[in-house]
Amino acid sequence: MNKQNKKIIYIGDNRSLYTKYQCTSAPSVIFIAGLGDSFEIWKKVQDRISDVTSTLSYTRVGIGSSSVTAVPQTCHDLVEELSELLQELDVKKPYILVGHSFGGLIARLSASLNPLDICGMILVDAAPEFKELAYEQVLPENLVAGNREYLENPSLNSENIDKMQSYKQIVDHSRQTDLPLTIIARGLPDSGEEGWPSQKILEIEQNLQAEFKKLSTSSKFRIASHSGHYIHHDEPEIVIEEIILMLKEIEKALN
């Protein structure tokens, strides 16, 4: 296979997922995008990592060329979707999961539910559970109601995700492991609607992401100083570097 091996894969209930799969060796690096993003968001990083090991990126149900769903989904549903896809493609185990934004929640829950299949995890400006509630500490009063509605109403996000239920699933299955874990947080504030306290929100998110270190006894935290939320676009070399470092560490541990 080559780097341009893009195809639609059908999983249970005839759902279709648009994928980009490069099969070479194990471990396989699995890229999990944030809400509303297709697999193309990983292009710069995936193409480089495909030179050294197997990689898979995919577009979830409800986005782009993948199937559409009208039913609210939870993080657990998306973990099952990924598991079915990995099985259908017979992707080589074990896996390093690389999750961006909401994709970080999918990676975390997948690692909790399938610990024997996962050998490492990299969180790229990953969404902390219940982050919207933390925002309320610094939001002006006129933005609190809209922020809470976005948290509680699945129809307001791009994939019809039940965030409240998803966050509860993360909390219920959270436990400390010794899984190699790298956390990369953005260093620049993102622009929001008028009155949005971008710098204060950045500080909250960096602090919450630093707490991810407690998820593993083998964790590291890094800030991408020149990146906004899309670190894999702004500074792809950082994500590439951390994946390659983890691959080397895993190889060393196995030998």
Language-model region placement:
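Conserved hydrolase catalytic core segment
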Residues: K92-F130
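Alpha/beta-hydrolase
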Residues: I32, Y58-R60, V124, A185, ...
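N-terminal cap/lid segment of alpha/beta-hydrolase-fold proteins
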Residues: M1-S16
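Conserved HGGG/HGGXW glycine-rich cap/lid loop of the alpha/beta-hydrolase fold
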Residues: R15-S65
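Catalytic active-site module of serine/aspartate enzymes centered on a nucleophile-bearing elbow/loop
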Residues: S219, S225-N255
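Active-site nucleophile elbow and catalytic-triad environment of alpha/beta-hydrolase enzymes
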Residues: S155-H173, I204-E211
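Flexible "cap/lid" loop of the alpha/beta hydrolase fold
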Residues: I122-E159, G192, W196
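Active-site loop/oxyanion-hole signature of alpha/beta-hydrolase fold enzymes
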Residues: G12-D13, K20, S57-V98
